């Protein structure tokens, strides 16, 4: 089960054999009030996913030109490498939308961050590439208001995990 602040509060109360307290209920209420904005953000990121992925990969290639000039399976010197880069950026974006829908960092923690260092070192991938891609997505997602705040929270969380 994916952890969210609500599921953690329920688990803690259940472990202690008690009902949810006022603080926990207020926290749940706050989450439900933000849920509409989170769903709007997930919908916006999803509907613009290909544009965001394409722009993010171009931002990586511009900041790190060696990624398109160096041959090898971890680089984007050919169409196969470019496809892998787009796939990886898409994976990050998809997991961010899952976190928005779940209302917590559980999907990011479980599906992305756990084992991230091992994956990057095994395949000789630079976290800075994905930081740049996520910064581009954050700056260009086209969301506004509370939906932008919700999306940026999870994008920043992923950036911090990579940094």
From Swiss-Prot:
GO cellular component terms attached to this protein's record: phycobilisome; plasma membrane-derived thylakoid membrane
InterPro entries in the cross-refs: Globin-like_sf, Phycobilisome_asu/bsu, Phycobilisome_asu/bsu_sf, Phycocyanin_a
The entry's keywords: Antenna complex, Bile pigment, Chromophore, Electron transport, Membrane, Photosynthesis, Phycobilisome, Thylakoid, Transport
UniProt-annotated binding residues for (2R,3E)-phycocyanobilin: 85
Record PTM: Contains one covalently linked phycocyanobilin chromophore.
Source superkingdom: Bacteria
Record bears the keyword Aminoacyl-tRNA synthetase: no
Membrane topology label: Peripheral membrane protein
GO terms classed as biological process: photosynthesis
Leader sequence segment: none
Cross-referenced Pfam families: Phycobilisome
Compartment(s): Cellular thylakoid membrane
Record text on subunit structure and interactions: Heterodimer of an alpha and a beta chain, which further assembles into trimers and the trimers into hexamers. Part of 2 PBS rod complexes, the conventional PBS rod and a photosystem I-specific CpcL-PBS rod.
Sequence similarity: Belongs to the phycobiliprotein family.
PANTHER family cross-referenced by the UniProt entry: C-PHYCOCYANIN ALPHA SUBUNIT, PHYCOBILISOME 32.1 KDA LINKER POLYPEPTIDE, PHYCOCYANIN-ASSOCIATED, ROD 2-RELATED
Function per UniProt: Light-harvesting photosynthetic bile pigment-protein from the phycobiliprotein complex (phycobilisome, PBS). Phycocyanin is the major phycobiliprotein in the PBS rod.
Protein's recorded name: C-phycocyanin alpha subunit
Organism, scientific name: Nostoc sp. (strain PCC 7120 / SAG 25.82 / UTEX 2576)
Gene assigned in the entry: cpcA
